């Protein structure tokens, strides 16, 4: 089958990465369709909807490239599957990663299903990751070549079935090259800045946004031995290892968040970047997913490396099943400020094995106060 007989539906955001993705596939001769996903009603205070601006850029790029385009609305699915989860996690005192859930439930489920109904053979996105297809049909996901932009961390929940229908055309080139291609082709998005922050918050103030949905409950900020250091404005506004916004003055080392007590509405703080309370030896994680589950013996356990947050250096770990629903991940050396609600993502070299959601964090001598 030649490329012209293979239909690829590209998820287009109005940014440079997805624009170049569509261009590359068109140049390679595929039957390309561009689709813009509207996942959030983001009309700002002035009545301007940034999604409309982004869709206008998609239209212009698709016209430049010469491919058809459509828009699809997933606002309900996004609210039900991503935003509700986001709020529930904050209510539990955790720090969620909505991008992971958005990829799992929207971009590579709702959007993938929609594309297949349009007769797509594959979907493609502008993610910095790579797919390796083996002769027997199974696939592996590899880190993007641009180490600074690699996005496998956010794709860790994707299954073999999902990845078998996915292309990441820019995963094997550097971001600077993506910009160069866009400029060379005169694409309107060539100099558009990258989006930052959580997709549905955009440039809004995080505290202000969250307070619209969850009532803040101020409480005491204390040290682990009970010394009161001030007031916090609501546990949901703080994450483990956070330094800024505590409002603790005085001399000496800066102060950091080392834990939360939901029952008593207490925020624990301690002084010093390397305070012992910030370090842990192992974690328990649930909702685990592996691209190739049969390759990993969870009962015997296996060694690999892991990331506990985006753009973090890999840490050597040992992964083993804790029970029917959870994994125990033991670190080769203590790790600082691991945060419940975030993803732990596993690697063998460049291959992303999968990931899980961090639930509880421990020192060898017992559970930490991270979220209790």
UniProtKB/Swiss-Prot annotation:
Bridged cysteine pairs (disulfide): 102-199
GO MF annotation list: ATP binding; tRNA binding; tRNA-uridine 2-sulfurtransferase activity
UniProt GO cellular component terms: cytoplasm
Top-level enzyme category: transferase
UniProt KW Transport keyword: no
Residue positions binding ATP: 11-18, 37, 126
Location of region: Interaction with target base in tRNA: 97-99
Pfam families tied to this protein: tRNA_Me_trans, tRNA_Me_trans_C, tRNA_Me_trans_M
EC number annotated for this UniProt entry: 2.8.1.13
Stretches the record annotates as Interaction with tRNA: 149-151, 309-310
Catalytic activity: S-sulfanyl-L-cysteinyl-[protein] + uridine(34) in tRNA + AH2 + ATP = 2-thiouridine(34) in tRNA + L-cysteinyl-[protein] + A + AMP + diphosphate + H(+)
Active site: 102, 199
SUPFAM superfamilies assigned to the protein according to its UniProt record, in alphabetical order: Adenine nucleotide alpha hydrolases-like
InterPro entries reported for this sequence: MnmA-like (IPR004506), MnmA-like_C (IPR046885), MnmA-like_central (IPR046884), MnmA-like_central_sf (IPR023382), Rossmann-like_a/b/a_fold (IPR014729)
Site keyed Interaction with tRNA: positions: 127, 342
UniProt keywords, alphabetically: ATP-binding, Cytoplasm, Disulfide bond, Nucleotide-binding, RNA-binding, Transferase, tRNA processing, tRNA-binding
Lineage: superkingdom: Bacteria
Entry's localization field: Cytoplasm
GO BP terms: tRNA wobble position uridine thiolation
Role played: Catalyzes the 2-thiolation of uridine at the wobble position (U34) of tRNA, leading to the formation of s(2)U34.
Family the entry assigns: Belongs to the MnmA/TRMU family.
Alphabetized PANTHER family for the sequence: MITOCHONDRIAL TRNA-SPECIFIC 2-THIOURIDYLASE 1 (PTHR11933:SF5), TRNA 5-METHYLAMINOMETHYL-2-THIOURIDYLATE -METHYLTRANSFERASE (PTHR11933)
Protein name: tRNA-specific 2-thiouridylase MnmA
Organism: Staphylococcus aureus (strain Mu3 / ATCC 700698)
Lineage: Bacteria, Bacillati, Bacillota, Bacilli, Bacillales
